[in-house]
């Protein structure tokens, strides 16, 4: 008798995606981050759902409702900190996942890669809107500064900003709509994840060598199910340590001050995971130029497949390209550090140099080094 998981219309889809899926045997732990992201999304949706049951999206009561969750709701404090720090874990996994894609040439599967970029934008938008909801000082001023960037768009900019605000400043209407979108977007992200996986399973997974691995496959279950569960347990352990020992480590103390439109904080900055893009934005003195650089710093990922000049897919056997990759990682860490610093000497010039280097590495140095490696290998 045939196993039901192979014949049942619904179970068959699950079986082909999670049980009998052929996976290259050389796939390393860097391929774990997809499942970790799925786990992060599940944690965020669950904790967010319970938080939404107690939260009120009104400027008069939003801050107090978050305080109420932490003080009066059973285990509300752990829900709130799991959700806030879960976002940090989400972005750590997200950036490593993208880094893996760049290092091992996963971007050559262009459909999967492009849906991934769309997912990145959706997650960033969700995180930004979520940061506004506690209605602290940094929530209010972060929302004001970031939405105001759209006013740099010629002709329609000012109208667009007021349309997003629902008035002439960030106020009750803004908070209400941000809560609505923050609740809705994770479900859209979950749907996009399905499309992401659909495209991935059309081509099959890449592997560290970058060489076709059709003759050497292993089934997803039990090998990768065990591997993924171990990864998820390690991530949840790290998240639990963060939540239970230093829940405010990655947050901003200013967000414990209720939003006050009459008092601007000395240093307005986003959460740590946006600091690299914020540093690029600030490094250009012109408003429109800064906004364009900000958008391009993420959108540049879309043209990475076009800049692939190497005859090899992966960087595994390309030491010069590896140097360029790690230089890019160091540059992004520098930008993250600069984004959290005040706008003064020497931080301004360091930020400008790091921003120029970021675009130079991706657009110029990586393709040139790849061509040089081709020449050295006489290809």
From Swiss-Prot:
GO cellular component: mitochondrial inner membrane; respiratory chain complex III
Subcellular location per the Swiss-Prot or TrEMBL entry: Mitochondrion inner membrane
Topology class, membrane: Multi-pass membrane protein
Residues that hold heme b b566 according to the record: 97, 196
Needed cofactors: heme b
Binding site for heme b b562: 83, 182
Record-level GO BP terms: mitochondrial electron transport, ubiquinol to cytochrome c
Pfam families: Cytochrom_B_C, Cytochrome_B
Record family assignment: Belongs to the cytochrome b family.
Protein name: Cytochrome b
């Amino acid at each position: 008798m045939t196993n039901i998981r192979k014949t049942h219309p619904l179970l068959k889809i699950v079986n082909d995606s999670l049980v009998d899926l052929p996976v290259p045997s050389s796939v390393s732990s860097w391929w774990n981050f997809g499942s970790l992201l799925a786990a992060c999304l599940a944690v965020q949706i669950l904790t967010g759902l319970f938080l939404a049951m107690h939260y009120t999206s009104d400027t008069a009561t939003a801050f107090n409702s978050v305080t109420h969750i932490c003080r009066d709701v059973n285990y509300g404090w752990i829900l709130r900190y799991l959700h806030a720090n879960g976002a940090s874990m989400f972005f750590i996994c997200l950036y490593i996942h993208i880094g893996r894609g760049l290092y091992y040439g996963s971007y050559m599967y262009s459909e999967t890669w492009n849906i991934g970029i769309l997912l990145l934008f959706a997650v960033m938008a969700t995180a930004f809107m979520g940061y506004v909801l506690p209605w602290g000082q940094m929530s209010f001023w972060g929302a004001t500064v970031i939405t105001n960037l759209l006013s740099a768009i010629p002709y329609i900019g000012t109208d667009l900003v007021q349309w997003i605000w629902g008035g002439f400043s960030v106020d009750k209407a803004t908070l209400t709509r941000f809560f609505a979108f923050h609740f809705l977007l994770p479900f859209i992200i979950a749907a996009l994840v399905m499309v992401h996986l659909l495209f991935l399973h059309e081509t099959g997974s890449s592997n560290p060598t970058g060489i076709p691995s059709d003759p050497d496959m292993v089934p997803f279950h039990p090998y990768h199910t065990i591997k993924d569960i171990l990864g998820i347990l390690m991530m949840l352990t790290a998240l639990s340590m963060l939540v239970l020992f230093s829940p405010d480590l990655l947050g901003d103390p200013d967000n414990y001050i209720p939003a006050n439109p009459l008092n601007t904080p000395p240093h307005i900055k986003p959460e740590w995971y946006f600091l690299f893009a914020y540093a690029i934005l600030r490094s250009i003195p012109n408003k429109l130029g800064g906004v364009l650089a900000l958008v391009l710093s993420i959108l540049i990922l879309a043209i990475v497949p076009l800049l692939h000049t190497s005859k090899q897919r992966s960087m595994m056997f390309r030491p010069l390209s590896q140097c360029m990759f790690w230089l890019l990682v160091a540059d992004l860490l520098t930008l993250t550090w600069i984004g959290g610093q005040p706008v003064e000497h020497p931080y301004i010039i360091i930020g400008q140099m790091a921003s120029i280097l970021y675009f130079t590495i991706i657009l110029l140095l990586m393709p040139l080094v790849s061509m040089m490696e081709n020449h050295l290998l006489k290809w």
